[in-house]
Swiss-Prot record:
PANTHER family: PEPTIDE DEFORMYLASE (PTHR10458:SF22). The gene is def. Disruption phenotype: Probably essential, it was not disrupted in a global transposon mutagenesis study. The keyword Transferase does not apply. Keywords: Hydrolase, Iron, Metal-binding, Protein biosynthesis. Fe cation binds at C111, H155, H159. It comes from Mycoplasma genitalium (strain ATCC 33530 / DSM 19775 / NCTC 10195 / G37). GO terms for biological process: co-translational protein modification; translation. This is Peptide deformylase. Binds 1 Fe(2+) ion. Its cofactor is Fe(2+). It is an enzyme of class 3 (hydrolase). Its EC number is 3.5.1.88. One of its GO terms (molecular function) is metal ion binding.
C-alpha cells in the first residue's frame, strides 16, 4: 500500500506524548512499523521531490516516528548536503560518539511539529557518529556525519528523546556563539523535520 502524505499525520509540540522518550522497535518489523515507515518516506520524499505544495504539506528534510503518532525509535532523512544526496531510515539509533566542539545552522532550525517560530542558534555537536539498523541496507550501519546531514541526524535523534530544537537555543541570549563553533550555511529550500 502506498500513502499520499497529509499534514493531518503530524503531531505537534503541544501534545504531551511527543515530549516523552520513544520505545525501541522490536524485530522482526511488524505491520504497524512498516506502515509508519511508508508514511515517513511518503512525507519526506514528497518534500524532496518538490511536491509539498501539491500535497499541501509542510516541507521537511527529516521526520521522526513520533511526529506522526508512532512512539517508536526510528526516523527518516532525505536531503542534499554539499550537492550530495543523503538518505537514511534508522531504526533504534544510538549516538556513539560526538565532537566536543559545537556547530549551528546559520539560518536556524525549523520543525514539522512546531508551529511557533523560535529564533536563535540551535547549538549541536560539530560532528556525530551514530549507529542503527538501516531500513534500506537491511543491516546495522554506523554513520559519521557533519554539516547539514549531521545537524539533521541530531535533530531527529532529539525527537526520539522527547526533545525539540528550541530547547537547545540559549534562553538568555538566543544568538550567543563562540568563535570556535562551526557555522553551517546550507542552501536549503525546506525546514528540518
Amino acid at each position: 500500500m502506498t500513502f499520499q502524505p497529509t499534514k493531518t499525520w503530524l503531531v505537534f509540540d503541544d501534545n504531551a506524548l511527543i515530549n516523552k522518550p520513544t520505545e525501541a522497535v522490536n524485530f522482526p518489523i511488524d505491520e504497524q512499523i512498516e506502515t509508519c515507515i511508508k508514511k515517513m518516506i511518503a512525507y519526506v520524499d514528497a518534500s524532496y521531490d518538490g511536491k509539498a505544495q501539491e500535497y499541501d504539506i509542510i516541507p521537511g528534510i527529516g521526520i521522526a516516528a513520533n511526529q506522526i503518532g508512532y512512539w517508536k525509535q526510528l526516523f527518516y532523512i532525505h536531503l542534499n548536503d554539499l550537492n550530495k544526496e543523503k538518505k537514511c531510515l534508522l531504526i533504534n539509533p544510538k549516538i556513539i560518539d560526538q565532537s566536543e566542539n559545537k556547530a549551528f545552522l546559520e539560518s536556524g532550525e525549523g520543525c514539522l511539529s512546531v508551529k511557533k517560530q523560535h529564533k536563535g542558534y540551535v547549538i549541536r555537536s560539530e560532528w556525530i557518529t551514530i549507529k542503527g539498523y538501516d531500513w534500506f541496507e537491511k543491516k546495522e550501519i554506523t554513520i559519521k556525519a557533519t554539516g547539514l546531514f549531521g545537524m539533521c541526524l541530531q535533530h531527529e535523534f532529539d525527537h526520539l528523546q522527547g526533545r525539540f530544537f528550541y530547547q537547545r537555543i540559549n534562553p538568555l541570549n538566543p544568538w550567543f556563539k563562540k568563535p570556535e563553533w562551526k557555522v553551517i550555511n546550507p542552501t536549503l529550500k525546506t525546514s528540518n523535520g
